[in-house]
Every structure is written in C-alpha cells, then in structure tokens.
Amino acid sequence: MNSAEAFAAIALAAVACDGSLGRDEAHALRAQLEYRSLYSSSSEADMGDLFDQLLHRLRDQGVNWLVDEALPVLTLPQQQSALAVAAHLAHADRTVTEEESAFLESLSKQMALPEGEAASILVAIEALNRDSLDA
C-alpha cells in the first residue's frame, strides 16, 4: 500500500465504519480527496480503480484491517491530516454515530501523534462542523 492508497483507506474506513456509506458521506469523501496533491494527477478512472480496490479489501478484511495496513505507511503529518479528514467525514451526514465515535477514538489511539494532539484535532473538527445555531 502506498501513501495515496493509505490516506484514502483511512478516509474510506471513516465513512464505512458504521456499516453504511450514505450519499452525503460519499460526496464528502470525494471532495476531501480530489483536491489533495496525492490525487491531483489521478483520472476519474484511476480514482474509481483505487476505491474499487479499497472497497474489495474492506469487504474481505474489514475496517480494522484496512486501518492497520494503512497507518504504518503514513508519515506523521499525513496521519494528522488523515485523522482530521476522518473526523470531518464522520460529521458529513450531520450525525456522528456511536460506531463513528468509537472508530475515531480507536484511530486516535493507534496513531503515533504527540500526547493530546489527536484529541485536539477531534475537538477542532467537531467545532468546525457544529451548527452554531444549535444550542
């Protein structure tokens, strides 16, 4: 697995961890990846092939396996970004399920981030996605 596959794997795991891949989540996943330098030279067909391959692995091996394979490939800055994107994607459908919360917690613990950094990233992304009109 290369870094482009690994980063996409974490993002896909985030949207699939609750057992469903909704339309809002799929659109958010695509939007989060398409402007990043890792994917900027990828064609529609390349991206389709990448996700077909990752979805096959996800179905065969599960979310945890996908994350376990992806994390060691990512550098520390890539892990930071992957966690932020995963958290943002969990909020894409405006509801964070228990499964998504548990996934983000587990992902945070598996990353080699400095003490407290993962929690700070999650809090920041939650604040970013909060509807300020809600109490």
How should each PLM-predicted stretch be described?
Residues 1-135:
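Small-residue-enriched hydrophobic alpha-helices in membranes
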